[in-house]
Amino acid sequence: MQRITITLDEELLDVIDRRVATQGYQGRSEAIRDLLRAGMRESEALPDDAACVAVVSYLYDHSTRELPRRLNQTLHAHHDLTRSTLHVHLDAGHCLEVSVLQGESGRIGELSRQLMVERGVEHGQVQVIPAPGQPKVR
């Protein structure tokens, strides 16, 4: 096993610490490993060429330099996947976007990752559902 260093904001660290306390982990490392494993399982659930629908949601700080423009460009570059998008102004500095996507699992995963790794995106989640007629993932 290798030791690594990561940087987390205080709020995220508080969430992890609460998870450690409430779920009985021995420490942060095991809790973070479990979260990473769950995220990797979710992203590997469907073959890249499987047809699916998905909901991607993310909260971001719209004052982050050029972030709204970059997010918009990313969505436009994948316009063929986007069925609908909802944009909500949560407060003076934060927006929530929810997009319904349809297409191949690999392309949807790529788009979701591009959106969520942008600096200034604070929370992101994607839920992928096999399209009607596709085999269910176990």
From Swiss-Prot:
Coiled-coil spans in chain: none
Gene3D superfamilies given in the database record: ACT-like. Chain A, domain 2, Met repressor-like
Cofactors demanded by this protein: Ni(2+)
Cofactor binding description: Binds 1 nickel ion per subunit.
Pfam family, one: RHH_1
GO molecular function annotations of the record: DNA binding; DNA-binding transcription factor activity; nickel cation binding
Keyword Metal-binding carried by entry: yes
NCBIfam families: nikR (TIGR02793), PRK02967.1 (NF002815), PRK04460.1 (NF003381)
Similarity field: Belongs to the transcriptional regulatory CopG/NikR family.
Chain's role: Transcriptional regulator.
Protein name: Putative nickel-responsive regulator
The species this protein was found in: Pseudomonas putida (strain ATCC 47054 / DSM 6125 / CFBP 8728 / NCIMB 11950 / KT2440)
